Design a protein with these regions (language model features):
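Active-site metal-binding motif and surrounding structural segment of the metallo-beta-lactamase
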Residues: 32-78
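Conserved beta-strand hairpin/beta-sheet module of binuclear metal-dependent hydrolase folds
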Residues: 1-41, 47, 118-134, 151
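Cap/insert and terminal regions of metallo-dependent hydrolase folds
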Residues: 140-239
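Binuclear metal-dependent phosphoesterase catalytic core
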Residues: 3, 101, 123, 227-249
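Active-site metal-binding loops of divalent metal-dependent hydrolases
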Residues: 8-9, 29-31, 57, 81, ...
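Metallo-beta-lactamase
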Residues: 76-127
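A general structural motif
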Residues: 22, 47-49, 73, 126, ...
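Structured catalytic core of nucleotide-sugar glycosyltransferases
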Residues: 6-15, 57-65, 105-107
């Protein structure tokens, strides 16, 4: 059985755990050791081999890496430049797919204002999970890599109108809207339309607390897909405090 659980999602911290009977894959670690332990205490993952994959160096994805990897004795993987930026001497620099037990973890380069950012597409015995956030545009390479995901955890960061009228400075608004920023709800919907299948479970992630709401994100994406007769298995938003549903595949 393959398990997926997003522990936390948003500008104050991101972390996702995916595991089978032997191995635990951690995607990003932007939360504290205490919160990680609280969120995972009843998952039964203590005795699994643990590996951590970091998408980029921003603190909401990496602040807990040192403490948590040390406590769990987890190997850390990321792009070489990202490891350097995080001052992690013991991490493993990756370019292509990494095989760990029954898992494959494929990094896909994305556009974001970090040194060498990636997202991850995870495979395990025919099951595919895509964990995609912190990017301003979606490339054809990424659309192809996500194709037919069983779980698609994808950024729906902002509603453009809320961003336009919101409290951020114009410079920050421009950064968020740029090709190196974050996906809007409609950009997320466009990617889902192209890459999801009828059986895809959709998790909308990294929602801005100031420029989006769960209801607006869900309504925007659902309306886009409904108007194009696009089917999918389920849809939810992941939150900062409660994460996502625990999925067992």
């Amino acid at each position: 059985m393959l398990n997926f659980y997003m522990l936390s999602s948003g500008s104050r911290g991101n972390s996702t755990v995916i595991w089978d009977e032997n191995d635990l894959i951690i995607i990003d670690c932007g939360i504290s050791l205490k919160k990680f332990q609280e969120k995972t205490s009843e998952l039964g993952i203590e005795n699994l081999e643990k590996s951590m994959f970091i998408s980029h160096e921003h603190s909401d994805h990496s602040s807990g890496v040192r403490a948590i990897s040390r406590k769990l004795q987890a190997d850390v993987y990321s792009r070489g430049k990202t490891l350097e930026k995080m001052h992690l001497e013991k991490g493993y620099s990756i370019r292509g797919e990494v095989a760990i037990g029954n898992f494959t973890v494929m990094p896909v380069s994305v556009d974001h204002d970090a040194v060498d950012p990636v997202v991850y597409v995870i495979g395990n015995r025919g099951i595919k999970i895509s964990v995609v956030s912190d990017l301003g545009i979606i490339s054809q390479e990424l659309l192809d890599a996500m194709q037919g995901s069983d779980i698609m955890a994808i950024e729906a960061n902002h509603d453009p109108e809320m961003l336009r009228t919101g409290p951020y400075t114009e410079m920050l608004k421009m950064r968020i809207r740029s090709e190196h920023g974050h996906l809007s709800n409609e950009q997320s919907a466009e990617a889902i339309y192209v890459s999801a299948s009828d059986n895809t479970r959709i998790v909308l992630t990294h929602l801005s607390e100031k420029n989006n709401t769960p209801d607006i994100a869900i309504e925007t994406v659902k309306a886009y897909l409904y108007n194009r007769n696009k089917k999918y298995a389920s849809m939810e938003t992941a939150s900062q405090d409660f994460g996502s549903t625990l999925y067992r595949l």
